Amino acid sequence: SVNSFISNQDERAANRYLSEFSQLMRSVLENSEKDFIPLEKEIELLELYVKLEHFRFKDKFEYSITIDDHLNVNEFVIPPMLLQPYVENAVWHGLRYKKEKGKLEINFQEIDPETVLITITDNGIGRKKSQELKTENQKKQNSKGMGNIQKRIAILNQMYKDKVDVQVNNIFENEEGTQVQLILKK
C-alpha cells in the first residue's frame, strides 16, 4: 500500500497510512502480553485495522461497525486481537476476490447484561470458493492461523470457565458469504 502511494506520488496518503499502521502495531505490542483487554480497546483496534484494509482495498468493499446503544463496552473484557483474524479472513479470502464491491458488517449487540454477541458478516465469495482459489502453501498458512485462534479460545475457556464461544457459518445457500458469531460473557 505504501509503495503504491509513493509510486503514485501521494505522500500525504503514504504518511497517513504509515502513521495509522504504526499506531496499530504499537497497540498490538502493548496488548500482546495480556490475557484480556477492555472491549472498548479491542473495538478501537478493530476500527483502525478495518480502516487500513479499506484504505488498501476501497474498490473491493464497504464496511460498517455498529455498537448496540445498550452495550457498555467498558464492562466487558476480551482476549486482545481475537476478532482481527476473522475480519482479516473476511477481507482477504472473501471480499478481495469478489468482482463487484462487497460489504463487511461488524456488530456488537448486548444479549443480556452478562453477554455480548459479536457478529462479523461479509458477502464475499465464501469459504468453499476461497479454498479452491488457494495454493497449497496458502491453505497451510490459513489453517494455522484459524487453528491458533481455536487453541487460544480453548485455553482461555479452560482457564476462565467458557467465556468465549465462536461459530462460523455460510450465510447464503450458494455458500457465498460468511458469518462469524462470537459470544462473549463477563
Please name every model-derived segment.
Residues P79, P85, V180-K186:
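Short, proline-centered helix/strand-breaking motifs
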Residues S1-D165:
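Two-component histidine phosphotransfer core
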Residues Y63, L104, E176-L184:
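Hydrophobic core positions in the C-terminal catalytic ATP-binding module
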Residues D165-G177:
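A short beta-strand-to-loop micro-motif at the C-terminal edge of the catalytic HATPase_c
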